């Protein structure tokens, strides 16, 4: 059937263009790196350098001393992958151990001691094997392994920063 030749005519209406709804931009969260955090600088790690480790570090261990109920005070002094660890635990018993460190080819930092720390009172204090890898913003994420079953989180803070 042919279409009618007289189309209905109406006054045209102007439709306002709808403005696009403003989309809330997700705020970019830039986490501040604590100035005393251990930063495993990517370039150094790639080249096998542990310069970022040189200096004095306070290790914050998530363990408690059975005598005081507080974590032991552990301080590492490291220069060119060699150094000492000083532990104060219990009723101010001071222990020392020789430490050495290095980078694995996978970029993990290892900090080890040869045996337990020797203490001023003649006792020995177990020292963990520490493993760190670069996390968010290259801040070191570390864990302290005392034995196959005991692994605790550990945070390094630059001493005197």
Can you say where each PLM-predicted feature lies in the sequence?
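Tryptophan-anchored aromatic micro-motifs
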Residues: 36-69, 142-143
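Broad, structure-driven detector of short, well-ordered beta-strand segments within folded domains
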Residues: 74-80, 128-135, 154-156
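N-terminal glycine/threonine-rich, aromatic-flanked beta-hairpin/loop signature
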Residues: 63, 67-108, 142-145
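N-terminal localization leaders that direct proteins to membranes or organelles
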Residues: 67, 116, 126-128, 151-161
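Contiguous, well-ordered beta-strand patches that form the walls/edges
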Residues: 88-139
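Edge beta-strand at a domain terminus
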Residues: 28, 39, 97-108, 137-161
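Amphipathic/hydrophobic helical signal segments and adjacent flexible N-terminal regions
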Residues: 1-52, 159-161
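Short glycine/acidic-enriched loop and turn motifs that connect beta-strands
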Residues: 64, 118, 147-149
